[in-house]
Amino acid sequence: MSINLLDFDAKGLTGFCAEIGEKPFRARQLLRWIHRTGEADFDAMSDLAKGLREKLAAAAVIEPPKVISDHTASDGTRKWLLSVGAGNGIETVYIPETSRGTLCISSQVGCALACAFCSTGRQGFNRNLTVAEIIGQLWWANKALTETFTSEAGRERPITNIVMMGMGEPLTNFENVVTSLDLMLDDNAYGLSRRRVTVSTSGIIPAMDRLRERCPVALAVSLHAPNDALRDQLVPINRKYPIRELLGACERYLQSAPRDFITFEYVMLDGVNDSVAQARELVQLVRDIPCKLNLIPFNPFPDSGFRRSSANAVSRFRDVLMEAGLVTTVRKTRGDDIAAACGQLAGKVLDKTRRVPRNIAEAAG
């Protein structure tokens, strides 16, 4: 069986080159061809000797997930549904802005954490994605977007930021996610800054500590509630890793973080977590931690049981936080007409936790 070179970071490619009798510098050449150029055909790698190209073709492949569908929203947001085999699909979303282009990447087929307000969590969990399936999302998107991208003010390439906020909990797929992060940061591959790569977690504390040691990038924490009683309901992993312990892990993470703050994400649910009293409680909870609050309007999906907070409720909540001196933003809703907004990604998941096939709408249109 051929080896998929998308599964390897620089260290892995160096080891592979040694196994086929090649010197370490060949790994750097391969990294540049595969990731910087987006080349999947060994014959097109013109600075590699013919003999090496033949060895590569005999032993290896460059095989990202296959694109099932590609939809663009009215606001320019683009969503790909990618096949990862056995009837499963994952979703990747590109959000263009004037000064940056952000790619939202999935880390699992489904998610086992079952957050109450998240479409992905409702579909159950099938498996972790491989490195090739994680980095392959960036590979595909970079290739597709580069074909039509023109230099814009403030950026010279289509993808400037990565957020691991797609399907799945990244920190329960730790090794594959970290290897993918290494590729994102590698100057011979994508060359992104640690400050521009963000991992979002629901609060897997041991893995947060490991990430701080192994590959500290920007961190976002899905908080969504100002106390344990409510967070236990909305984010069930809180029963294992309660808020006070989570905040302690955040403080430890800041010792190595590329940014001097943690982002706390807070989805706004009408009548659930959006009162002024809850805003004040949230202030008391996080005021001693260098942080930014990101308020996220809830994005509806069928049978969610939740409603989006009104604009007035969001404004009142934000004002309480800002008056207390907390940096607070309200996330713009992007791509909701193609189900690409936060909390809507669901792909196509064969749930192995409940053994029930779930076919989710791929996209509108």
Swiss-Prot record:
The active site is at 91 (proton acceptor), 342 (s-methylcysteine intermediate). It is found in: Cytoplasm. GO terms for cellular component: cytoplasm. Gene3D superfamilies: 1.10.150.530, Aldolase class I (3.20.20.70). It comes from the Bacteria. [4Fe-4S] cluster binds at residues 111, 115, 118. Keywords: 4Fe-4S, Cytoplasm, Disulfide bond, Iron, Iron-sulfur, Metal-binding, Methyltransferase, rRNA processing, S-adenosyl-L-methionine, Transferase, tRNA processing. This is Dual-specificity RNA methyltransferase RlmN. It comes from Nitrosospira multiformis (strain ATCC 25196 / NCIMB 11849 / C 71).
